[in-house]
């Protein structure tokens, strides 16, 4: 019966439970695991989530010719009234630091030199080298602000964050 099943369940000693193992869940796990024991729950295979299959890139203001105001305006225009300005501003203002954190984790984003067809997938060696990232321009954007990992950005982000989480003693 159900009560016997509950008594036989494994008990985990943890401080934080994160439901979801995509980019958001793994990022939260990695950002909290230095001061807490973290358990990440997934409803199925880890790579069944949307992050793994996302092919596009990540939009961030990383070029001197671009600005947060321009990115916000582009996003609000493309969102045709569905976006909340305060949320868009919040995300855009933090986009460069989020990309910097992903670079520090080792996500192999395409760089200007690798985009020239060297075949090398080396990522910038430090967040200070964000200027070496290859930027593309996609629909709805007035500037080149899309960073990518070839044509499989989501897979690269997911695999890197998953590896970091597996390596962390508190996750």
Language model: regions and residue ranges:
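Conserved N-terminal/central alpha/beta ligand/cofactor-binding core
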Residues: 5-6, 43-171
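General small-molecule cofactor/ligand-binding pocket signal
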Residues: 12, 39, 110
């Amino acid at each position: 019966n159900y009560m016997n099943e509950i008594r036989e369940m494994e008990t985990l000693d943890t401080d934080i439970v994160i439901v979801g193992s995509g980019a958001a869940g793994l990022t939260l796990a990695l950002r909290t695991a230095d001061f807490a024991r973290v358990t990440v729950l997934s409803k199925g295979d880890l790579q069944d989530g949307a992050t793994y299959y996302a092919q596009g890139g990540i939009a961030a203001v990383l070029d001197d010719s671009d600005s947060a105001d321009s990115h916000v305006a582009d996003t609000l225009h493309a969102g045709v009234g569905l976006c909340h300005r305060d949320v868009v501003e919040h995300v855009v203002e933090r986009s460069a630091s989020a990309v910097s954190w992903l670079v520090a984790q080792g996500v192999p984003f395409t760089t200007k030199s690798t985009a020239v067809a060297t075949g090398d997938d080396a990522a910038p060696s430090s967040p200070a080298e964000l200027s070496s990232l290859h930027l593309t321009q996609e629909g709805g954007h007035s500037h080149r602000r899309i960073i990518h990992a070839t044509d499989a950005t989501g897979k690269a982000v997911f695999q890197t964050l998953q590896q970091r989480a597996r390596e962390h003693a508190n996750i």
